[in-house]
A protein has these predicted regions:
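Helix-loop boundary and gating motifs at the non-cytosolic
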Residues: 4-61, 108
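Helix-to-coil boundary motifs at intracellular loop junctions of multi-pass secondary transporters
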Residues: 39, 77-78, 131-136
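Central cavity-lining transmembrane alpha-helices of secondary-active solute carriers
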Residues: 53-73, 157-160
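C-terminal ends and interior cores of transmembrane alpha-helices
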Residues: 65, 86-106
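Cytoplasmic membrane-interface "Motif A"-like loop-to-helix N-cap segments
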Residues: 75-91
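Short hydrophobic/alpha-helical segments at membrane-entry points of transmembrane helices
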Residues: 106-114
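Cytoplasmic helix-loop-helix junction between adjacent transmembrane helices
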Residues: 113, 119-150
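Glycine-rich segments within core transmembrane alpha-helices of 12-TM secondary carriers
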Residues: 143-167
């Protein structure tokens, strides 16, 4: 086979996307906006809560846009890709778990913690993506990338379904 590494490395890389996409589908696209509007922004006018959510997403996106070139350069030149991947992934996981502690009406804390979760998620993605050339030869890189993408959609979709069934 043309893999630089064994199948275990390829599947390990792909299965990271399984968990990673679960954050995107369940937290970012699915439930955070609903919980934000109905719980953390309790009592706020719908236009105000929409503006607050938009502001939070914009600030997080702006910070990610500022960080991405620096993190990308670190990923391209550095040898600590896995350490940075783990750091940012843990940041995302811890911030997502911390949302449990945010009380009703505390929209500011919810936005701050959510934004930190997005920074963790996005920062981890930079280093996750940078690992692909290390596990796949150039002629197999599309296949391995597609494997991660498809496994990610499957994982994200399954968790989203489980979460919907829980509500």
């Amino acid at each position: 086979c043309c893999m630089k590494s064994d199948k275990k490395a390829v599947w390990g890389w792909a299965l990271y996307d399984w968990a990673n996409s679960a954050f995107a589908t369940t937290v970012m696209a699915g439930f955070f906006p609903i919980f934000f509007k109905q719980y953390w922004s309790h009592g706020a006018d719908v236009n105000v809560s929409t503006a607050q959510l938009g502001f939070g997403n914009s600030i997080a996106s702006f910070i990610v846009a500022l960080m991405a070139p620096v993190l990308g350069a670190m990923a391209d030149k550095g040898s600590a890709k896995k350490k940075f991947l783990v750091f940012f992934a843990y940041l995302g996981v811890l911030m997502t778990a911390a949302l449990f502690l945010v009380q009703k009406g505390q929209w500011g804390w919810a936005i701050f913690i959510y934004a930190m979760g997005i920074i963790g998620f996005s920062g981890a993605n930079v280093f996750y993506d940078s690992l692909l050339p290390a596990i796949a030869d150039e002629e197999k890189i599309d296949y391995v990338s597609g494997l991660g993408f498809s496994v990610g959609y499957l994982g994200g979709g399954l968790l989203f379904l489980v979460n919907v069934l829980m509500t």
